[in-house]
């Protein structure tokens, strides 16, 4: 299990308000699909700053937010919620996924390549699911943003089937360091 205190102690996080003993599960980076009880992670994109959507996440039921920019945070309004400040949310989520993976002793199949990664991942997961409970990459969330969220979705599966893609030099090495395929 992961706790707010793990982010504080292991990844230089700062608790702005809330419960450091809260269990962290059900991470989400998109307020359009956030569910009650999720942990919202505000990630900066090319044309948006996910930190700006923290209030929307709370209004839709998020129990905590992990942010790297708190200039707009209203702790008077959301002081009863858990808000964690980190240096960089994208780096934090990668480190958190790597830490969670280090706690797991299960087989992990990693699939990469130029063409056919998603189809191959789906076929391998389908075959394994006839005998095992499988966690697999959803769709093609196979980069330095999507892959950590896959690892963080782990509950009690027997095996993981992870798709790894790249769009910049060194990304496969970075993802392999998180996934540690067996």
What are these regions (language model features)?
Residues 8, 91-182:
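Phosphate-binding loop of NTP-binding sites
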Residues 1-95:
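N-terminal leader/targeting and accessory segments in enzymes
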């Amino acid at each position: 299990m992961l706790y707010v205190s793990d982010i504080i102690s292991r990844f230089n996080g700062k608790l702005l308000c809330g419960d450091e003993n809260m269990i962290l599960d059900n991470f989400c980076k998109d307020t359009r699909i956030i569910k009650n009880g999720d942990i919202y992670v505000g990630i900066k994109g090319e044309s948006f700053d996910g930190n700006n959507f923290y209030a929307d996440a709370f209004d839709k039921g998020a129990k905590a937010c992990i942010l790297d920019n708190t200039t707009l945070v209203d702790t008077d309004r959301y002081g009863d919620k858990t808000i964690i400040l980190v240096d960089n949310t994208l780096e934090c989520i990668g480190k958190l996924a790597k830490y969670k993976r280090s706690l797991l002793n299960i087989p992990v199949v990693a699939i990469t390549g130029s063409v056919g990664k998603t189809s191959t991942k789906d076929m391998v997961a389908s075959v394994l699911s006839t005998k095992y409970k499988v966690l697999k990459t959803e769709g093609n969330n196979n980069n330095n943003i999507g892959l950590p969220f896959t690892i963080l979705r782990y509950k009690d599966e027997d095996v993981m089937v992870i798709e790894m893609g790249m769009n910049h030099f060194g990304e496969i090495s970075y993802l392999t360091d998180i996934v540690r395929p067996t």
